[in-house]
């Protein structure tokens, strides 16, 4: 019967499993934010304000992440710029 199992349609994931996956992503995101310094949201807003002087972007177009290693901290800044026409 193995060959017939191959042709059976794959069932869509249940809404419970989709909700569980989404919740795990949210929890992981919140845990990563817990270890960030207090000044990071203010810094992100100030960077957005400076970029807006030159380019029209939204708040969601700038992501800032602080990674800490043993002896070094890395501030990663990702800015999605609009396409030039």
UniProtKB/Swiss-Prot annotation:
Alphabetized UniProt keyword annotations: Cell cycle, Cell division
InterPro entries hit by this protein: MinE, MinE_sf
Family annotation (Pfam families): MinE
GO annotation (BP), single: regulation of division septum assembly
Coiled-coil ranges per UniProt: none
Family assignment from sequence similarity: Belongs to the MinE family.
Function comment: Prevents the cell division inhibition by proteins MinC and MinD at internal division sites while permitting inhibition at polar sites. This ensures cell division at the proper site by restricting the formation of a division septum at the midpoint of the long axis of the cell.
Designated name of the protein: Cell division topological specificity factor
Organism taxonomic ancestry: Bacteria, Pseudomonadati, Pseudomonadota, Gammaproteobacteria, Oceanospirillales
């Amino acid at each position: 019967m193995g060959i017939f199992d191959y042709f059976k349609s794959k069932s869509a994931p249940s809404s419970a499993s989709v909700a569980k996956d989404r919740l795990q992503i949210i929890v992981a995101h919140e845990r990563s934010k817990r270890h960030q310094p207090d000044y990071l949201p203010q810094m992100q807003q100030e960077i957005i304000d400076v970029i807006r002087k030159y380019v029209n972007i939204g708040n969601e177009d700038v992501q800032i992440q602080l990674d800490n290693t043993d002896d070094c901290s890395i501030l990663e800044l990702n800015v999605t710029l609009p396409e030039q026409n």
